């Protein structure tokens, strides 16, 4: 899901996938920038300081994203104001947090399902960002979860993991 652009040997820009509400397109990158762009004109509606490379989720008037540091942010879709920030990696020891780099997430049934680069699936209550559970599914990077037919699927290398 991440797009990488290299400019010589000095700058590497990684963007998230684009998400849209039909009027604006939203994207973030690893340079601490989160944008709302007018879909027709390309003009920036607002810009926020959020360091994220993963696809955001639009829910009603809000945009939910997870930063590279494991902060779950809820932003106002209309003006970019940060409404809420929760550290979803707070239960992980500081020196181990780099191992839990967020890869992708979905929100379903009031829960956030977040995959990491070290094969973990975090199940977090969306309302208060408390841990429900952490599942060790693999030792390597998992892809972004997919919700289909009341079940969650996660791809890894050449396999699909089904979560009930």
Residue ranges and their predicted role:
Residues 102-123:
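C-terminal hydrophobic structural anchor segments
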Residues 24-27, 63-65, 73, 111-114, ...:
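Conserved beta-propeller blade signature
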Residues 1-22, 43-60, 84-107, 131-149:
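Extracytoplasmic beta-rich repeat domains
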Residues 20, 27-33:
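Beta-propeller domains
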Residues 38-42, 77-80, 125-129, 164:
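Short loop/turn segments that connect beta-strands within beta-propeller blades
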Residues 52, 68-77:
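Redox- and metal-dependent alpha/beta enzyme cores, enriched for Fe-S-associated oxidoreductases
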Residues 31, 69, 118, 157-158:
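Surface-exposed loop/turn positions within WD40 beta-propeller blades
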């Amino acid at each position: 899901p991440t797009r990488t652009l290299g400019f010589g040997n000095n700058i590497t820009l990684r963007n998230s996938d684009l998400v849209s509400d039909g009027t604006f397109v939203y994207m973030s990158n690893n340079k601490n920038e989160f944008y709302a762009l007018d879909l027709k004109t390309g003009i920036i509606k607002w810009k926020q300081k959020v360091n994220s490379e993963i696809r955001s989720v639009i829910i009603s008037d809000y945009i939910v994203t997870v930063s590279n540091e494991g902060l779950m942010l809820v932003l106002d879709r209309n003006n970019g104001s940060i409404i809420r920030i929760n550290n979803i990696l707070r239960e992980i020891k500081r020196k181990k947090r780099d191992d839990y780099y967020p890869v992708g997430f979905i929100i379903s049934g009031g829960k956030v399902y977040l995959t990491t680069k070290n094969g973990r699936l975090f199940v977090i209550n969306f309302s208060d960002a408390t841990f429900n559970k952490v599942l060790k599914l693999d030792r390597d990077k998992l892809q972004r979860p997919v919700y289909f037919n009341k079940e969650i699927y996660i791809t890894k290398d050449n396999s699909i993991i089904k979560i009930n």
